[in-house]
């Protein structure tokens, strides 16, 4: 069940329907079993980001504190770091991920989790350094809906 909720709740966050996404994600994260540990963590990150975009930073941080993220891959580490507004650390993690990591160049532009990070000079400088193009160029070029991109 939690596997089916992941794309639905992500799309709700993209559409800025944070309240509904939040309710579904609370349900999904409280299920007794999950498809995988990675899927459970994706749901927790999405729940935390729904709280963040509802201006409930305390609940965002509380959600993130429910699991130990220290042994996670860089992609999870980046998401958690961005949700905590630790943008200098996030830029370092971006460099570690590089141009061919799990998070692709369009993901940095499209994923709602990076919304606040994209507004920083750390993001613009690091993105340009990694991908050789300014992120603003991508923002103006691609009009394909996020859910239809494969890159």
Model-based region annotation:
Residues 2-121, 129-151:
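Alpha-helical protein-protein interaction modules
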């Amino acid at each position: 069940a939690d596997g089916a909720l992941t794309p639905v709740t992500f799309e709700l966050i993209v559409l800025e329907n944070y309240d509904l996404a939040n309710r579904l994600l609370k349900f999904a994260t409280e299920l007794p079993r999950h498809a995988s540990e990675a899927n459970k963590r994706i749901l927790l990150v999405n729940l935390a980001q729904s709280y963040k975009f509802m201006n409930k930073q305390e609940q965002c941080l509380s959600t993130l504190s429910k699991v130990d993220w220290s042994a996670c891959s860089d992609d999870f580490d980046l998401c958690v770091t961005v949700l905590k507004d630790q943008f200098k650390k996030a830029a370092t993690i971006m460099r570690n991920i590089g141009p061919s990591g799990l998070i692709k160049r369009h993901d940095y532009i499209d994923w709602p989790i990076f919304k606040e990070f994209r507004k920083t000079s750390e993001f613009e400088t690091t993105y340009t350094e990694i991908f050789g193009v300014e992120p603003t160029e991508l923002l103006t070029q691609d009009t394909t809906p996020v859910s239809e991109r494969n890159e």
